[in-house]
Amino acid sequence: VQQCIQLVADPGVPTVQKTYALRVMVNPMLVMEASTERVMTPELVQALAVQVWRQVQHGAGVYGDDELRVELLQMSTLVLEHSADLLASESTTKMDAIKFGWSFLPLEDVTVKHAAYLLISRFLQRFESPLKITGQVYVGLLRLPPNDGRGLVRRALDILVPALPERVPSTDSTSPPLWVKWTKRTLLD
């Protein structure tokens, strides 16, 4: 995994090779991590944050290929799914993870955008986040038009919706929770 992270960070390596390494080696290992021994360590998570997640924040155009973006987002989602406890102690690393996903939301490619929503939904499920961010992501998911990537949107909603009662607490016991109001308003629009 460490070598693949270094491979992805290396600008001299062709994009196809990076994508293939993630698709064939790293992501399957992370999928199996739930049923086998832990693959990710605190050092690997830190390397991922420094060499992959922070590169997007610096405006580096290293991830120009949509297939590579999807594989990186999938890898990041799997890390959050199976190794969120390794990020919990490092607030900077947590911020790097959500900023990484957030940076792909404005892109045109539907699959990349939906994979980014999936990553952010997993993040919001696992960690406390400002109410404004949770609301933006939830409403953004509800407003996405039906198209080819709808399966990813459903997965993101399946992850986020059960966490909403905890992440968006009700202010008043007599009125419906805020996230119910968001849903109603979005459906009426």
Model-derived features with residue positions:
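C-terminal, active-site-flanking charged/polar segments
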Residues: 113, 121-126
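HEAT-repeat alpha-solenoid elements in large eukaryotic scaffold proteins
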Residues: 16-28, 52, 64-83, 97, ...
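Short linear interaction motifs
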Residues: 2-4, 94-101
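Short, intrinsically disordered, charge-balanced linker/junction segments flanking boundaries
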Residues: 1, 25, 48-58, 76, ...
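Short coil/turn segments at helix-helix junctions and helix-capping linkers
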Residues: 7-19, 35-43, 55-70, 88, ...
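Alpha-helical recognition domains of nuclear gene-regulatory proteins
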Residues: 3, 7, 28, 55, ...
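Flexible loop/turn segments at the boundaries of HEAT repeats in alpha-solenoid HEAT proteins
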Residues: 1, 30-46, 83-94, 124-135, ...
